[in-house]
A protein has these predicted regions:
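Carbohydrate-active catalytic/glycan-binding domains of CAZyme proteins
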Residues: 2-29, 35-350
């Protein structure tokens, strides 16, 4: 995999073809090419979502990267849960099933009572996979974001080993932001940036050092990206991609983790600069509560949110979790194609 490439850019560049990896994934099913017009109707009549099988339940905050031999999915869980697929459709739990066997000791010292690790994000640059993760407790902004790296995701390789580099950024009880839900993007000039945030004063961004993956000493500004003033200030889970002349900031509004009562939904804004300002389709700044809705609930799939984006075979897919009303509200993996209109705005059918 080439240097200086994040998951989004690597997939978008077309380097994720089988030739780019020196492997051939045979027998791949034909993936859907077009979307019907998006609808707000709470009916499950569309055929756009990928028909997934395997280990799909108990998935929160999913993110996918295509590596040397397969697709890998990372999600919230005890030690960061890992799943693997060779075709993007059938998912199997890896063995061992987690990145960590326990919450790192350094994180427990800083966040007493933390029981699990949340909202991972993975990218490849500087010859390593960089997985950012968060540790916190519900309802608190005493939180930390850490970094663990690996030179390969192939567990059969002799080089496979996760190396934890510890603290990247933290937030405190007397602060106005929350250091969880990290997402990395490398801008068009080759500089890495980490966005993060949940509730409080919203989504923030800081510049990273390319060599270390840690905060930059050259630019220490904490840039504000998005904020809400209603629904308890519920905006979180940033994910940024670059497309055409714009950077697109996806976030989740409202409430997760309530089963079929969850009201999570993905919103988006865009900017010509990675640090903003981001505005929605109506021109409302995301720092003023703006956002154009992307995902909608259906009779079956409630609270579709906390997304990542995967570009594969010429299609952008939104990867997220939703709560399955036909399975007692269990959080479940969903992958759906995005369609971009003539004005450069994304949408997805329910």
């Amino acid at each position: 995999m080439p240097k200086n490439v994040t998951r989004r850019q690597f997939l978008r560049s077309g380097l994720m073809s089988t030739a780019g990896f020196g492997v051939v994934l045979t027998g791949l099913p034909r993936l859907p090419r077009r979307l019907a017009s998006p609808s707000v109707l709470l009916q499950d009549t569309n055929m756009t979502a990928l028909e997934l099988t395997g280990s799909l339940k108990q998935v929160h905050d999913p993110v996918i990267i295509k590596a040397e031999d397969a697709y890998y999915l990372f999600s919230t869980g005890n030690g960061i849960a890992v799943r693997r697929s060779t075709d993007l459709l059938e998912w199997k739990t890896t063995f061992p099933p987690n990145v960590f066997t326990r919450v790192p000791a350094w994180a427990l010292e800083m966040v007493p009572g933390a029981a699990s690790m949340w909202a991972p994000d993975i990218s490849y640059f500087n010859d390593k996979y960089h997985l950012y993760y968060s540790v916190s407790t519900f309802g608190s902004n005493r939180s930390v974001i850490g970094l663990v790296t690996n030179v390969t995701l192939d567990r059969e390789s002799d080089d496979f080993e996760w190396v934890d580099h510890g603290l990247v950024v933290e937030s405190h009880l007397d602060g106005d932001y929350n250091a969880i839900d990290p997402n990395l993007i490398i801008d068009t000039d080759g500089a890495p940036w980490l966005s993060f945030g949940s509730y409080w004063s919203g989504i923030k961004m800081l510049r990273l050092d390319y060599a270390t993956g840690m905060p930059s000493d050259e630019d220490t500004t904490l840039y504000p990206l998005a904020r809400r003033f209603v629904e308890s200030g519920s905006v979180e889970a940033p994910f940024i991609i670059q497309r055409g002349d714009f950077y697109y900031l996806f976030v989740s509004f409202d409430f997760c983790c309530r089963g079929t009562d969850s009201t999570y939904r993905v919103m988006v804004g865009r900017s010509e600069n990675v640090t903003g300002p981001y505005v929605d389709r109506q021109g409302i700044a995301m720092l003023e509560g703006g956002g154009t809705q992307v995902t909608f609930p259906t009779d079956r799939w409630r609270g579709p949110g906390h997304n990542s984006i995967l570009h594969e075979d010429g299609i952008d897919y939104i990867v997220h979790h939703a709560y399955d009303a036909q399975s007692q509200g269990v959080p479940t993996l969903r992958i759906q194609p995005l369609e971009w209109d003539d004005e450069g705005w994304p949408s997805v059918a329910p």
